UniProtKB/Swiss-Prot annotation:
The lineage of its organism: Eukaryota, Metazoa, Chordata, Craniata, Vertebrata. It holds the Pfam family EGF. It is found in: Membrane. This is Protein delta homolog 2. Residues 1-26 form the signal peptide. Glycans are attached at residue 157. The gene is DLK2. The chain crosses the membrane at residues 307-327.
Length: 383
């Protein structure tokens, strides 16, 4: 035992500490403090053990919640007369003093503070407080967990108090939570009970499918190409010389164009209109272009559409010129002048046409008609 400390009781864990050289004054509180349930503090007051209370630690602490009881040891609940139960809250004379049964029900005491009521016909409940009303008669008509209410059975009709997510007279209708179309980007809405879920298409995520997944997050583009995100897809902006979905292909370098004069065998002619003045002959107005020249023009940079257009235009022009020549020859053989300048028989009345201006003159009256000039049918010559 250290100097200046003296234990007052075997149960007490506290000591009275005195200053060195000063006597310990234990008689200040020991005369009135219940040392069996506490000890003296340095200031002379009683310090109670756990489970005891009071100025002198003379009273035990009852069980928490004990209403009509006492204790002999800490944490007890000893009921007073007329009370029962764990917390002494049950009235043993409840059937005689309180009459809890309603609507003419008879109270029967069961002991230990418990009772039950014998209800009259048409009533039920612990205290016969409920009447056999519409809810009782309908046999729990509310569905999906709804609560039937009929004002304790005294209402004419019942009503159903529905849980969240259901509506209807008997809570039979599940509210369509997809009615407002909460899912975006073409997602499928799945209705539940007071909830919904979105089945997102590929490329989208989130509760409402509003998050576009970054397809460039995995860095699919090669060769240092820049990735551009799309909906469930991506594009790679490849540098020069590379191609493919992810720029994985090395594009070949095209060879410089070369011109080779290859013999093509027999030369074919393409007829196109000439640009200069044409002489008056059957072959006038024609320009011959060989296939070799066309090939050289194509190698010089003339595209296939332009070449096709050139050939078609040349063929049409050749056909038109040929038709004109044939018609001219046919008319010349018949002695009929083609449409154009006014023509009359040339001197000596030869069957030829002249391209000069017409000069109309009257024949002398005594000059006979030439025999080799046949008269035209349907025309009359005035002399």
């Amino acid at each position: 035992m250290p100097s200046g400390c003296r234990c007052l009781h075997l149960v007490c864990l506290l000591c009275i500490l005195g200053a060195p050289g000063q006597p310990v004054r234990a008689d200040d509180c020991s005369s009135h403090c219940d040392l069996a349930h506490g000890c003296c503090a340095p200031d002379g007051s009683c310090r109670c053990d756990p489970g005891w209370e009071g100025l002198h630690c003379e009273r035990c602490v009852r069980m928490p919640g004990c209403q009509h009881g006492t204790c002999h040891q800490p944490w007890q609940c000893i009921c007073h007369s007329g009370w029962a139960g764990k917390f002494c809250d049950k009235d043993e004379h409840i059937c005689t003093t309180q009459s809890p049964c309603q609507n003419g029900g008879q109270c029967m005491y069961d002991g230990g503070g418990e009772y039950h009521c014998v209800c009259l016909p048409g009533f039920h409940g612990r205290d016969c407080e409920r009447k056999a009303g519409p809810c009782e008669q309908a046999g729990s008509p509310c569905r999906n967990g709804g609560q039937c209410q009929d004002d304790q059975g005294f209402a004419l009709n019942f009503t159903c108090r529905c849980l969240v997510g259901f509506v209807g007279a008997r809570c039979e209708v599940n509210v369509d939570d997809c009615l407002m179309r909460p899912c975006a980007n073409g997602a499928t809405c799945l209705d539940g009970i007071n909830r919904f879920s979105c089945l997102c298409p590929e490329g989208f995520a989130g509760r409402f499918c509003t998050i576009n997944l970054d397809d460039c997050a995995s860095r699919p583009c090669q060769r240092g190409a820049r990735c551009r995100d799309r909906v469930h897809d991506f594009d790679c902006l490849c540098p020069s010389g590379y191609g493919g979905k992810t720029c994985e292909l090395v594009l070949p370098v095209p060879d410089p164009p070369t011109t080779v004069d290859t013999p093509l065998g027999p030369t074919s002619a393409v007829v196109v209109p000439a640009t200069g003045p044409a002489p008056h002959s059957a072959g006038a107005g024609l320009l011959r272009i060989s296939v070799k020249e066309v090939v050289r023009r194509q190698e010089a940079g003339l595209g296939e559409p332009s070449l096709v257009a050139l050939v078609v235009f040349g063929a049409l022009t050749a056909a038109l010129v040929l038709a004109t020549v044939l018609l001219t020859l046919r008319a010349w053989r018949r002695g009929v002048c083609p449409p154009g300048p006014c023509c009359y028989p040339a001197p000596h009345y030869a069957p030829a046409c002249q391209d000069q201006e017409c000069q109309v003159s009257m024949l002398p009256a005594g000059l006979p008609l030439p025999r080799d000039l046949p008269p035209e049918p349907g025309k009359t010559t005035a002399l």
